[in-house]
């Protein structure tokens, strides 16, 4: 989330100038930068998905990041809109398997963005630095910033 904002100064300014946008921005960036990109499940019954039969007791990988950018579910799915009003993303899973810590994580993200942007409204990744993002768990090992 901080890496994305460091690369998008207009969004940084929005959050610094209008902190009321932060809760929506958190949800949108969770949709876009889904922290856990996939989960493994076992089917409980025979089913079919998009014409593909899946037998009971099959192991399937659910790609949450893909679901969160599905154009059938999202208007302008391939763009980030921190003003997006309806945002029922799957960044924390869903149903009985939903992350128990999702409410705490959201609160932590809101507080971090509020406090950071109140103190450091402008920041960026230094020129020439390439960010190394882990593909399975959306994380960056090192995020150098200048402000």
What residue ranges belong to the model's regions?
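Cytochrome P450
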Residues: 1-147
